[in-house]
Structures are given as structure tokens and as C-alpha cells.
């Protein structure tokens, strides 16, 4: 149970700051649990990611990020969906703030779609104070 709670915390990139609805939290929790199981990440890896530790280059962690971002519609086949990101985060954080972070992060490209997702997650995490 603690593992699922940890996942729900890391999944929406500062969910508390964004004040997600109960429904949004439930969806994030379910998607996170599914992706964690699918990719086989450990509790320690989830905690590290939640705490902003992006030193883990384990492909499982990177593919977890990809799985989650695809489930919520932010990525499709490694490509950022800027309209979806703005539609989902804009009402929570303000469109101008989200657009500013998008300008910094959305051109991120990694070696493959999992690496791209991980780098994108890291960029959004590091710029979360702006959204």
C-alpha cells in the first residue's frame, strides 16, 4: 500500500501544488500503479524519482516515465502533445505558467522514447515551481 501511495505522489508532478481533484488523483494513482507493475520499478526507485533524484539510469525507470506520460496523454510515441499538456495543466497552474515551462521542456529529445520521457519528466520536475 505504501508503494502505491508513493507512486501517486510522484505521478502528477507536484500534485499537491496543482490541487488535483479526487478523480484526477485516482486516475494518476491507477496509471502509476499499472506502469510501475508493467515496468517493474522498485519502491526505492519510485521514492528517488518522487524526491527529484534523476541519477538512476535504469531503463525501467525511464520506461516507467514514458508509460505514465503516455497514459495521461502528454506523450504519444515519444512526441510531446503540447495541447494536451496545456489543457490538463493550464486550468490548474495557469496557462502562461504552463506555456513558459513548455517552452523550456517540450523540445527535449532523448536516445529513445523512454529516455525522452524521463528527460521531459525531469525538466517539468525541475521547473515545477513555475507551474
From Swiss-Prot:
Keywords noted in UniProt: Disulfide bond, Olfaction, Secreted, Sensory transduction, Signal, Transport
GO terms assigned for molecular function: odorant binding
GO cellular component: extracellular region; extracellular space
Tissue: Exclusively or primarily restricted to the olfactory system. Expressed in all olfactory sensilla including antenna, maxillary palp, proboscis, other adult chemosensory and larval chemosensory organ. Also expressed in the wing and tarsal gustatory sensilla and dorsal organ. Expressed in larval hemolymph.
Disulfide bonds: 35-67, 63-114, 105-123
GO biological process, one term: olfactory behavior
Leader sequence residues: 1-15
Subcellular location: Secreted
SUPFAM superfamilies hit by this protein: Insect pheromone/odorant-binding proteins
Pfam families: PBP_GOBP
UniProt-listed InterPro entries: PBP/GOBP, PBP_GOBP_sf
Functional summary from the UniProt entry: Present in the aqueous fluid surrounding olfactory sensory dendrites and are thought to aid in the capture and transport of hydrophobic odorants into and through this fluid.
Family membership: Belongs to the PBP/GOBP family.
Full protein name: General odorant-binding protein 56d
Provenance organism: Drosophila melanogaster
